[in-house]
Design a protein with these regions (language model features):
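N-terminal beta1-alpha1-beta2 submodule of the flavodoxin-like/Rossmannoid cofactor-binding fold
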Residues: 1-76, 80-81
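FMN-binding flavodoxin-like domain, especially the glycine-rich phosphate-binding loop
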Residues: 55-149
Length: 149
Protein backbone atom coordinates (compact mmCIF):
# COMPACT_ATOMS: atom_id res chain seq x y z
CA UNK A 1 0.00 0.00 0.00
CA UNK A 2 1.28 3.44 -0.93
CA UNK A 3 1.86 5.63 2.14
CA UNK A 4 -0.30 8.65 2.84
CA UNK A 5 1.95 11.66 2.22
CA UNK A 6 1.38 14.74 4.34
CA UNK A 7 2.94 18.18 4.03
CA UNK A 8 2.40 20.35 7.08
CA UNK A 9 3.40 23.60 8.68
CA UNK A 10 3.40 23.98 12.46
CA UNK A 11 3.87 27.27 14.24
CA UNK A 12 3.31 26.43 17.92
CA UNK A 13 3.59 22.65 17.69
CA UNK A 14 -0.10 21.71 17.52
CA UNK A 15 -0.03 20.58 13.89
CA UNK A 16 3.28 18.77 14.38
CA UNK A 17 1.81 16.96 17.40
CA UNK A 18 -1.30 15.96 15.45
CA UNK A 19 0.72 14.63 12.50
CA UNK A 20 2.94 12.70 14.93
CA UNK A 21 -0.15 11.13 16.54
CA UNK A 22 -1.57 10.35 13.10
CA UNK A 23 1.70 8.69 12.09
CA UNK A 24 1.68 6.52 15.25
CA UNK A 25 -1.95 5.59 14.65
CA UNK A 26 -1.13 4.58 11.07
CA UNK A 27 1.67 2.29 12.30
CA UNK A 28 -0.80 0.57 14.63
CA UNK A 29 -3.36 0.16 11.86
CA UNK A 30 -0.69 -1.13 9.48
CA UNK A 31 0.51 -3.64 12.09
CA UNK A 32 -3.06 -4.97 12.34
CA UNK A 33 -3.50 -5.17 8.58
CA UNK A 34 -0.67 -4.53 6.11
CA UNK A 35 -3.14 -3.12 3.58
CA UNK A 36 -3.63 -0.08 5.84
CA UNK A 37 -1.29 2.68 4.67
CA UNK A 38 1.46 4.22 6.73
CA UNK A 39 1.92 8.00 6.93
CA UNK A 40 4.96 9.87 5.59
CA UNK A 41 5.20 13.52 6.50
CA UNK A 42 7.31 16.52 5.61
CA UNK A 43 7.34 19.73 7.60
CA UNK A 44 7.43 22.93 5.59
CA UNK A 45 8.87 26.04 7.24
CA UNK A 46 10.36 29.39 6.30
CA UNK A 47 13.72 27.59 6.05
CA UNK A 48 12.46 24.92 3.62
CA UNK A 49 13.93 24.67 0.16
CA UNK A 50 11.10 24.46 -2.33
CA UNK A 51 11.03 21.16 -4.23
CA UNK A 52 8.92 19.68 -6.95
CA UNK A 53 6.63 17.13 -5.33
CA UNK A 54 6.44 13.84 -7.20
CA UNK A 55 3.68 12.01 -5.31
CA UNK A 56 0.14 12.93 -4.32
CA UNK A 57 -0.10 14.52 -0.89
CA UNK A 58 -2.43 16.14 1.62
CA UNK A 59 -1.75 19.46 3.37
CA UNK A 60 -2.27 20.16 7.07
CA UNK A 61 -2.33 23.85 7.95
CA UNK A 62 -3.31 25.83 11.06
CA UNK A 63 -4.87 29.28 10.96
CA UNK A 64 -3.08 32.42 12.11
CA UNK A 65 -4.65 35.71 11.03
CA UNK A 66 -4.14 39.38 11.74
CA UNK A 67 -7.14 41.65 11.74
CA UNK A 68 -10.45 41.43 10.02
CA UNK A 69 -13.18 38.94 10.73
CA UNK A 70 -12.34 36.67 7.82
CA UNK A 71 -15.57 37.36 6.00
CA UNK A 72 -16.42 40.91 5.07
CA UNK A 73 -13.65 43.12 6.39
CA UNK A 74 -10.46 41.50 5.29
CA UNK A 75 -8.07 38.79 6.24
CA UNK A 76 -4.32 38.77 6.56
CA UNK A 77 -2.65 35.39 6.83
CA UNK A 78 0.26 35.27 9.27
CA UNK A 79 3.09 32.77 9.67
CA UNK A 80 1.69 30.07 7.37
CA UNK A 81 2.28 31.89 4.06
CA UNK A 82 5.23 29.64 3.21
CA UNK A 83 2.89 26.65 2.91
CA UNK A 84 0.74 28.46 0.36
CA UNK A 85 3.84 29.43 -1.58
CA UNK A 86 5.11 25.84 -1.45
CA UNK A 87 1.84 24.42 -2.78
CA UNK A 88 1.90 27.06 -5.53
CA UNK A 89 5.50 26.26 -6.49
CA UNK A 90 5.88 24.87 -10.03
CA UNK A 91 3.27 22.07 -10.40
CA UNK A 92 2.97 21.10 -6.73
CA UNK A 93 -0.69 22.11 -6.59
CA UNK A 94 -1.50 19.45 -9.20
CA UNK A 95 -0.55 16.71 -6.72
CA UNK A 96 -2.40 18.14 -3.72
CA UNK A 97 -5.42 15.95 -2.98
CA UNK A 98 -6.91 18.09 -0.24
CA UNK A 99 -6.45 20.28 2.80
CA UNK A 100 -6.97 19.53 6.49
CA UNK A 101 -7.28 22.56 8.73
CA UNK A 102 -6.87 23.26 12.40
CA UNK A 103 -7.49 26.19 14.67
CA UNK A 104 -9.37 27.39 17.70
CA UNK A 105 -13.18 27.36 17.58
CA UNK A 106 -13.21 30.49 19.77
CA UNK A 107 -12.44 32.43 16.59
CA UNK A 108 -15.82 31.49 15.06
CA UNK A 109 -15.81 32.19 11.32
CA UNK A 110 -12.02 32.38 11.25
CA UNK A 111 -11.78 28.73 12.42
CA UNK A 112 -9.79 26.83 9.77
CA UNK A 113 -10.05 29.80 7.42
CA UNK A 114 -6.52 29.35 6.05
CA UNK A 115 -7.29 25.76 5.05
CA UNK A 116 -10.57 26.80 3.44
CA UNK A 117 -8.85 29.60 1.53
CA UNK A 118 -6.10 27.24 0.31
CA UNK A 119 -8.74 24.73 -0.80
CA UNK A 120 -10.44 27.44 -2.84
CA UNK A 121 -7.19 28.92 -4.17
CA UNK A 122 -5.79 25.58 -5.35
CA UNK A 123 -9.16 24.07 -6.33
CA UNK A 124 -8.85 21.07 -3.99
CA UNK A 125 -11.25 19.84 -1.32
CA UNK A 126 -11.28 21.06 2.26
CA UNK A 127 -11.35 17.57 3.75
CA UNK A 128 -11.50 17.87 7.51
CA UNK A 129 -10.76 19.95 10.56
CA UNK A 130 -9.69 19.48 14.16
CA UNK A 131 -9.28 21.89 17.03
CA UNK A 132 -5.86 22.75 18.48
CA UNK A 133 -3.94 19.44 18.95
CA UNK A 134 -6.95 17.31 18.10
CA UNK A 135 -8.27 14.26 19.92
CA UNK A 136 -7.83 10.53 19.47
CA UNK A 137 -11.17 10.48 17.69
CA UNK A 138 -9.96 13.20 15.32
CA UNK A 139 -6.86 11.13 14.53
CA UNK A 140 -8.96 8.04 13.78
CA UNK A 141 -11.51 10.00 11.72
CA UNK A 142 -8.91 11.80 9.62
CA UNK A 143 -6.79 8.67 9.10
CA UNK A 144 -9.83 6.79 7.76
CA UNK A 145 -10.68 9.70 5.48
CA UNK A 146 -7.16 9.97 4.03
CA UNK A 147 -6.73 6.20 3.72
CA UNK A 148 -9.98 5.96 1.74
CA UNK A 149 -9.08 8.76 -0.61
Amino acid sequence: MTPIKILFISIEGNTRSFVKDLTKYAVGMHDQDATNPLVESKEISDQSDFENETQPYFVFVPTYLDGGNGIDNGVKELMTNTMGEYIGYEHNADLCHGIVGSGNRNFNEQYCLTAKRYASRFNVPFLADYELRGTGRDVERIYKLLAAG
